[in-house]
């Protein structure tokens, strides 16, 4: 199964719901979305729509270490997950979070804890990590590691979660050759389940073009 969506709602939610059946909610990274907003999303979302939640930034700021701050942040996240019937959580490392043996162990312990609360747990290791360095630990914890298939190659696992950050950062868009290349890569893969999340400024248009190239 191939899922395509965006990081947040780049257009009004009612319009987004007409185009996609998946979104990675970004508001949960900064805090708890308003109760009215959450209820409206759930009410307006079509049948079969899936919400993933971006984990609280406090988790990364605390270095993924267990403690009261992380415990409180996770409790808030779980509350939103219950309202949206979300079973996927994505945790992003801060850009200055270094790759080290100690941090790999800490992240593994955190992912194991998160996996007891969410069916699918995803870790985006950030720019200082090679995804291959954390994948063994994440796999042991039952979690997925984010890759950019255009720059970091595809995942070798049957279930994969890709985030597309833009060819030159958040403010860039994918030109047609890049979309075509991404579609070629996607068509060649044999994942049982795979999710493609566009996170760049033109994510809505780029995700639609990718879906068209995939004939989805």
PLM regions: where:
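Residues lining hydrophobic/aromatic ligand-binding pockets adjacent to catalytic sites
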Residues: 1-216
């Amino acid at each position: 199964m191939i899922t395509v969506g965006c990081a947040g709602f780049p257009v009004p939610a009612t319009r987004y719901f007409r185009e996609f059946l998946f979104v990675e909610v970004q508001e949960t990274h900064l805090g708890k979305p308003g109760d009215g907003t959450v209820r409206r999303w759930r009410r307006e979302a079509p049948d079969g729509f899936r919400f993933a939640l971006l984990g609280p930034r406090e988790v990364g700021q605390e270095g993924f270490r267990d403690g009261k701050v992380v415990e409180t942040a996770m409790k808030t996240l779980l509350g939103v997950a219950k309202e949206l019937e979300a079973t996927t959580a994505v945790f992003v490392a801060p850009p200055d979070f270094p790759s080290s043996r100690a941090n790999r162990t800490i992240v593994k312990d955190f992912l194991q804890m998160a996996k007891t609360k969410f069916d699918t747990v995803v870790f985006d290791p950030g720019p200082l990590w090679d995804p291959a360095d954390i994948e063994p630990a994440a796999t042991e914890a039952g979690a997925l590691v984010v890759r950019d298939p255009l720059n970091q190659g595809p995942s070798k696992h049957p279930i994969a979660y890709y985030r597309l950050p833009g060819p030159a950062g958040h403010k860039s868009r994918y030109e047609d050759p890049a979309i075509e290349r991404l579609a070629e890569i996607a068509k060649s893969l044999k994942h049982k389940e795979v999710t493609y999340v566009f996170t760049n400024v033109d994510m809505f248009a780029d995700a639609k073009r990718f879906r068209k190239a995939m004939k989805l």
